[in-house]
Regions:
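Non-transmembrane domains of secretory- and envelope-associated proteins
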Residues: 22-120, 235, 246-299, 304-308, ...
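Short, hydrophobic/aromatic-rich segments at coil-to-beta transitions
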Residues: 194-200, 226, 305-313, 336-340, ...
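Solvent-exposed N-terminal domain segments of exported/luminal and surface proteins
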Residues: 23-225
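Loop-centered beta-sheet repeat module
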Residues: 209-267
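Bacterial N-terminal signal peptides
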Residues: 7-16
Length: 416
C-alpha cells in the first residue's frame, strides 16, 4: 500500500509538472499544503496507541529509515504512534505560493530568479536533474514565520551522568525579505540591504559566559557570505568575525550548519531529490517542549505519526568537508526537516539530527500560529557518544520587535 501511495504522489507531481506551467492549480495547492484534509495516512499495524520498540520493531520496517530503525531494534529508544496531525502553514504563505510560484526560475549559477514569497517550487519532478536544487531552495524558504523568539537551554549530554555543558540563552530569527504580507503589513524591511534574515543569540547563564552575544546577517543572495559579529563581556566590544559553517559549536562536534537540519549555504552542496515516502516521524506532539528519553535521554519519545515525507540528499562540494553526505527527511506539508542523517567521510552514519515540531493547539500563546512550532532539537553523535540538545522553555512567533533590536550598539547596551 505504501508503494502504491508513493507512486500516486510521485505520479501526481510529475503529471502536474507536465500539464501546468502558467499557474499553480488548486489541485497542486491541495496536494502540497493540505495532504491530510481528505484522508489521513493509516496502516493497520500502526493504529494509534501502538508502541514501536525493540520487541515490535518489525511492524515499522517499512515506515522508518534503516538507520533509525536500527536504533529502535537495538533498544536505544521506543515511542507510541498517534493519529496524523493536519498542520497547514499560514494562509498568506499558501496564497503567495499560488500567486507567485509559476514565475520562479533557477539562474545559471543556481540562484533564484523571480521569487517573491511562498514556496518557490511546489512542483517537484523526481526525474528532473534540478529537482534536488529546487527542493533545497524550498527548504531555505519554508514558512518559518516573520519572527521567532526562543528561550531555551543548550545542553551537551553524554551517554551517562550530568551534562558536560549547559547554556541558557535567548535566540531570535527575524526575516526581512520574501515574507508574504499579512493584514496589509509589510514585514520586508531589509530589502535595500539584501538581508534575508537576522539572527541574534544572547547567553544568559552560566556566569562565565553571561552576556556573550552574537549577531548574524544571512543575505538573500546565496553566493554572498554571512556577516557575523560577537560581543564578549571581557572586551566590552563588538567584533566582526568569520564563522565557517563547517566549524563546531561549543565543543559539541555538531557543525554550525547542522542546526535545524541544515542551516548552511545552498551552494555548498550538490542536491539530489530521492523521492516521496510515507514514514513515521516525531511531528504534532501535544506538548510545548519535547520529551526526550531512551539512550542518554537523547531521543524524542513523544508520540510519532505517519507523515508524507520528501527525501533530499546533499553531497558537500568541498573535498575536506567533515561529511560525505547528509540526507534530510522533509515533511511534505511544512517542508520542515524532521530528521537528518549525517555520514562521515568514510560513509558511516555518524549523527542524527531530530528537529521536533508540535501541535500549536497545545502550546500556550501559540494556539493561533500556522507555521511549524519548534519544540526542541537533538543532534546525536554516535562516534562521540553525546548529543547536542535544545530544551525549549518558551517560544513566541510573529511578535514584532523594535526597529533597532538588531543594531550593534544594542549589543553593547545589553552587555552592560
Amino acid at each position: 500500500m505504501q508503494q502504491r501511495l508513493c507512486g500516486i504522489l510521485c505520479g501526481l507531481v510529475c503529471l502536474t509538472w507536465q500539464t501546468v506551467r502558467a499557474e499553480i492549480s488548486a489541485e497542486v495547492i491541495q496536494q502540497r499544503f493540505y495532504p491530510y484534509a481528505a484522508e489521513k495516512p493509516a496502516a493497520a499495524e500502526l493504529a494509534p496507541g501502538t508502541t514501536i520498540s525493540k520487541d515490535t520493531w518489525e511492524i515499522a520496517k517499512a515506515y522508518l529509515p534503516p538507520e533509525i530503525l536500527d536504533k529502535v531494534k537495538a533498544g536505544e529508544f521506543a515511542f507510541a504512534v498517534q493519529e496524523t496531525t493536519d498542520l497547514p502553514v499560514s494562509a498568506a504563505y499558501i496564497e503567495a505560493t499560488k500567486k507567485h510560484a509559476d514565475q520562479v526560475k533557477l539562474s545559471a549559477e543556481g540562484e533564484l530568479e523571480g521569487y517573491v514569497a511562498g514556496l518557490p517550487f511546489p512542483l517537484l519532478d523526481p526525474a528532473e536533474p534540478q529537482a534536488g536544487l529546487k527542493a533545497a531552495w524550498n527548504l531555505r524558504y519554508r514558512d518559518f514565520g516573520d519572527v521567532m523568539q526562543v528561550w531555551n537551554t543548550f545542553r551537551l549530554v553524554p551517554e551517562t551522568g550530568s551534562p558536560d555543558r549547559e547554556i541558557e540563552n535567548y535566540y531570535v530569527v527575524a526575516y526581512g525579505m520574501h515574507r508574504p504580507l499579512t493584514d496589509g503589513v509589510n514585514p520586508n524591511k531589509w530589502e535595500k540591504d539584501g538581508v534575508l534574515y537576522k539572527e541574534f543569540y544572547h547567553i544568559l547563564t552560566p556566569f562565565d559566559l553571561k552576556n556573550t552575544m552574537s549577531l548574524k546577517h544571512r543575505y538573500v543572495r546565496d553566493q554572498a557570505n554571512d556577516d557575523n559579529w560577537t560581543y564578549t563581556p571581557a572586551s566590552r566590544k563588538v567584533r566582526k568575525v568569520i564563522v565557517r559553517h563547517e566549524d563546531t559549536l561549543y565543543d559539541s562536534g555538531a557543525l554550525n550548519e547542522d542546526y535545524f537540519g541544515f542551516w548552511g549555504y545552498v551552494r555548498s552542496y550538490s542536491w539530489k531529490f530521492l523521492g516521496v515516502q510515507r514514514l513515521l516521524a516525531p511531528v504534532g506532539a501535544r506538548v510545548a517542549s519535547a520529551t526526550f528519553g531512551g539512550r542518554g535521554h537523547w531521543y524524542p519519545v513523544d508520540p510519532w505519526e505517519l507523515r508524507v515525507m520528501l527525501v533530499l540528499e546533499g553531497t558537500p562540494k568541498a573535498s575536506d568537508h567533515p561529511y560525505s553526505k547528509r540526507v534530510l527527511y522533509l515533511d511534505q506539508q511544512t517542508f520542515a526537516p524532521v530528521y537528518t542523517l549525517l555520514y562521515d567521510r568514510q560513509g558511516r552514519h555518524q549523527r542524527t539530527v531530530f528537529d521536533l515540531y508540535g501541535n500549536p493547539q497545545f502550546n500556550p500563546g501559540n494556539e493561533h500560529v500556522r507555521v511549524p512550532v519548534w519544540i526542541g532539537e537533538s543532534i546525536i553523535d554516535y562516534e562521540s557518544k553525546n548529543a547536542s540538545m535544545t530544551i525549549i522553555t518558551k517560544i513566541l512567533y510573529n511578535v514584532p520587535l523594535p526597529d533597532d533590536f538588531f543594531n550593534l550598539d544594542k549589543m553593547v547596551a545589553r552587555g552592560q
